[in-house]
Regions:
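Predominantly soluble domains enriched in secretory-pathway, periplasmic, or organellar proteins
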Residues: 26-29, 40-45, 49-52, 60-66, ...
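C-terminal motif of bacterial Sec signal peptides marking the signal peptidase cleavage site
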Residues: 22-24
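Intrinsically disordered, low-complexity polyampholyte segments enriched for Lys and acidic residues
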Residues: 3, 34-36, 46, 55
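N-terminal acidic, proline/glycine-rich, low-complexity intrinsically disordered segments
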Residues: 2-4, 26-32
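Bacterial N-terminal signal peptides that target proteins for export
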Residues: 2-15
Length: 426
């Protein structure tokens, strides 16, 4: 199929001191009250080019160390620390280092195969930056594509995206990236989170080959797609379309949207069950969490215990417990999904955003956007273990089980990296 045609797009990959640089476009927009400035007219994307390091000076990441490494810590590109039998809720977060870079404006951060770290940098940088476990840039993937190359236009149509969220396929071969909106002559110059259905154009998700760091697939979605998740069996991709008031369900093999499920105002978070048959989706504007059948594309039920403005959700490995950040309640909720009852709740900070669950599920990590803090919660009783002031606007978070490192995306242009250490190592 033409829309699954592999096409080399502009990628900046570092080999020693050499770079291959990509062109990008810049245009601002707003996100869930995170707006920085008034949207401007979008720049029409130009054709992709390849430039050598001699022609364009490289911009390098600046890594600032904070704490000395523990004796057991390595990057996840090699063997991780040994299993010492210490539960995550018996450890404490220690800040290791922070990373800044001229191309970094992270809305989200995701851990990939081999300890690679992916940051989605929206329309402010028009790229996905790839880091290794020590915060060095491995690649820069430009978000510009020609839709004709993917069978989505009869004529050449250069567009740029706005990478907002990402999900790694279970086999580790691909990264799926949602684009908040598209930029080009045929698109309006702005979009915002205070939308009604039909206010903005539909968008696309990209599939990226993680061996070549290439965009090798482009699939239509609804308007302003945000969070997305691949089913454990790898067959389906579920995308929450914020301004479409629905979710797209995509066949990952054929790269086609097989259908949409209408949910209501501002769907946001997604958590798919372990058998890949169903997905929980937060409907932030309707103050609801819906359960969707991924084969029939219907709503099975809604959780009454969802609370106000549920944003991000993570599901326990046994599918019994759902953790939800409730944005305007400043809390995290623990829900028994079978009984639809609230097990516990904890206030972590102002405007709770993204969540990450430790591999032993004994701890939950939370970013609090307006407070500029990161919280660690004990899941057995939903008590607060730590709150760490990181400043800025922490918005994305990811936990690397192999290294016990926690990566925090600061929307002001940083990554902050912690290690969850046994108390004796601190």
């Amino acid at each position: 199929m033409m829309n699954s045609l592999r096409r080399r797009v502009t990628v900046s990959v570092i080999f020693g001191s050499s770079w291959v640089l990509a062109l990008g476009c810049a245009a601002p927009a707003s996100i869930e009250s995170e707006s920085e400035q008034t949207p401007a007219i979008a720049t029409t994307p130009k054709g992709t080019t390849t430039t050598t390091a001699a022609e364009v000076p490289a911009s390098t990441a600046v890594v600032t160390s904070v704490a000395p490494p523990s004796s057991t810590t390595t990057t996840s590109t090699v063997a991780g620390p040994p299993d010492d039998g210490v539960r995550s809720d018996e450890r404490r977060l220690v800040e290791l280092f922070s990373v800044t870079h001229s191309d970094l404006k992270p809305k989200s951060v995701v851990i990939g195969p081999g300890g690679l770290v992916f940051t989605q940098n929206m329309m402010y940088r028009h790229n996905i930056l790839v880091f290794d476990g020590e915060g060095d840039v491995v690649a820069k993937i430009d978000d510009s594509v020609d839709l004709k190359d993917f069978g989505l236009s009869d004529e050449s149509m250069q567009v740029a995206g706005a990478p907002v969220e990402a999900a790694v396929s279970p086999d580790g071969h691909h990264l799926w990236v949602s684009n908040y909106k598209m930029y080009g002559d045929q698109y309006r110059s702005d979009a915002d989170d205070g939308c009604d259905r039909g206010d903005w154009e539909d968008s696309y998700v990209y599939r990226i080959d993680l061996e070549r760091f290439e965009i090798d697939g482009v699939v239509p979605t609804g308007a302003v797609p945000k969070f997305l998740q691949v089913s454990p069996d790898g067959r389906r991709l579920v995308v929450a379309n914020w301004c479409g008031f629905d979710v797209s369900v995509i066949d990952t093999e054929t790269l086609t949207e097989i259908g949409r499920v209408d949910l209501g105002r501002h769907p946001r978070g997604v958590a798919i069950t372990s058998d890949s048959s169903q997905a929980y989706v937060t409907v932030m504007g309707a103050e609801r969490i819906d359960l969707i059948d991924l084969e029939r594309l219907t709503v099975v039920s809604s959780l009454a215990s969802s609370g106000i403005t549920p944003r991000h959700i993570v599901l326990s490995s046994d599918d019994a417990t759902l953790f939800s950040s409730n944005h305007l309640m400043d809390t995290v909720r623990m829900i028994d999904v079978k009984a639809d009852t609230l097990i516990g709740t904890v206030r972590t900070g102002t405007q709770t955003r993204s969540l990450a669950l430790a591999d032993d599920e004994a701890s939950l990590y939370v970013v609090n956007y307006l407070d500029g803090t990161v919280s660690k919660v004990k899941t057995t009783d939903m008590s607060l273990l730590q709150t760490i002031d990181v400043g800025g606007r922490p918005i994305g978070i990811a936990y690397d089980a192999l290294t016990r490192r926690l990566w925090v995306a600061d929307y002001d242009g940083r990554l902050i990296v912690f290690e969850d250490r046994a108390v004796s190592d601190n």
